[in-house]
Amino acid sequence: MNILITNDDGLTSNGIIAARNSVEDLGQTTLVAPLTQQSGVGHAITLMKPLRAIKTELSDKTYGYAVTGTPTDCVILAVKSIMDKKPDLIISGMNIGENLSRSITTSGTLGATFEAASFGIPAIAVSLQVNREDLKFRTGVNFIDYSHAESIVNKLAKKVIKHGMPEGVDILNLNIPANPDSDEIIQSNFADRMFSTDVEKRIDPYGHPYYWIVGDLIDDGIEGTDVHTLHILNQPAVTPISIDMDAQVNISKWLD
């Protein structure tokens, strides 16, 4: 069993070590992740410049490959060049912070799994809720306790390895509370939104405007959604994803 581990927080994030720890008893793991923070890049691919994959020592004295590109680039390089054999499973994470609702399309964590699915490889996106905003979007060592999350990921990965993906499912999007009430994983639908997106305009010292895209978290109270499961029930939420984007709607009459 060959398992590829990647992320969007970068190779130096402790989250990727936690992801590896969660499945190292299940097979041979290879870590290939971005050199720099890539949160929010979605399924972006690098086409206009060359990529490098740098063998790098991690904080626990093991090694991985730091790629000068996006999470999608990491999956492509790993599958087509770095790994001797095509991976049987790809895990993207553990992301520092949730990836919930239909906003997942902007997530680099999910972008890596979209690419995995395009290769026909089962993929699990793993995101861990954190209670401190200053821990998000950082590279390097952090002091998060991943032990409970590791056991939950191990549990789900074992099911994928033993049974394969459920029919029609390409990706499992797993979100884990910072301190879950139990390790019961609850299937949840995507909420409409996770953030109320806004734009903050500022003026630089030369009088020119610049902008930050900002947003506040939305606590969607709709039962059955991933936001509700994570934020209200305080339980791990998994959402099955298919990359078949066909709407399965006949619009021939509309076209007439």
Curated annotation (Swiss-Prot):
Its EC number is 3.1.3.5. InterPro entries: SurE, SurE-like_Pase/nucleotidase, SurE-like_sf. Binds 1 divalent metal cation per subunit. Gene3D superfamilies: Survival protein SurE-like phosphatase/nucleotidase (3.40.1210.10). The keyword Membrane does not apply. It is found in: Cytoplasm. Keywords: Cytoplasm, Hydrolase, Metal-binding, Nucleotide-binding. Its cofactor is a divalent metal cation. Nucleotidase that shows phosphatase activity on nucleoside 5'-monophosphates. Belongs to the SurE nucleotidase family. This is 5'-nucleotidase SurE. It holds the Pfam family SurE. GO terms for molecular function: 5'-nucleotidase activity; metal ion binding; nucleotide binding. It comes from Methanosphaera stadtmanae (strain ATCC 43021 / DSM 3091 / JCM 11832 / MCB-3).
